[in-house]
Amino acid sequence: MDFIDRWKSLGGAAQVPAVRESEADNVVPVIICASEERVGATMATINSVHSNTDASVFFYIVTLRDAVKLTRQYIEKTKLKGIKYKILEFNPMVLRGKVKPDSSRPDLLHPLNFVRFYLPLLDISHKRVIYLDDDVIVQGDIKDLFNIKLKPGHAAAFATDCDLPSTHEMVRSIGMQTTYMGFLDYRKQEVKDLGIHPRDCSFNPGVFVADVSEWKKQKITKQLEKWMEENFRQNIYSSAMAGGVATPPMLIVFHDKYTTLDPLWHVRHLGWSPDARYSESYLQEARLLHWNGPFKPWNYPAVHLDLWERWFIPDPSGRFLLVRPERDS
């Protein structure tokens, strides 16, 4: 299947041209997905990035056909209308024969969860890109994340799950997985044959910096697809385990082959419990907050709602609404 089958470029605002090759080096390209049901979350992430930097940021917003119009409207009818962006339509047919339906966490099987596997196939001329999940708020200057030094031979930089001593107690209390044992089925021979120790630290693929040319050189997308197909046949990990089916291929392919992000650039687990909280001083220090887990900040209950809501922009169409407890009048 060639590029044109996988992606369709839909352009951004009429006055915003696509980034030319000569300008690409001075731009911070951010890739983020926008699903119809969570479009307001994506816009909060974009708003936080845009508001906290003076860098020239270009947003590549990846969506499915049903959300193209909604996404463009959300930008053009709000304060975001000044951002530079391009909307790309993802064709979910590319996932046929690679992803099995599973009812335990259907949200983790959304086609857009797999966009991160196909980054080099986007019609962009950047050598390096940032990928952000839609349940993220950026409090720091995105160009600091973009300028991280990747080690030679590394196609990406992630935050390791063993990097935050201050969160270990909280992580243990809510049963969050931090090792490969929580993501792969070690009873399966295919997993044993990988030679990955079950207690090796996992990493979170919801925020990363990618070297596109290194990714292509190492054929990362092909490797990821191989493990998706393997799981489709053998069920070597299931969405009942931590991270669903989108995280394990990344963990396998990038095992011991990634640069580590500064922990403050990916403070996570905010969505794993409606009770577990970080200290206010630590959250102020954080450059990026991630509500990974089932308790999202646009729903209720969830923690640290104020840090997310300050970047939320109401949906001009009125379709994306926050879930909040009724207050006594």
Language-model features: where?
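Glycosyltransferase catalytic domains, chiefly GT-A lineage
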Residues: M1-S329
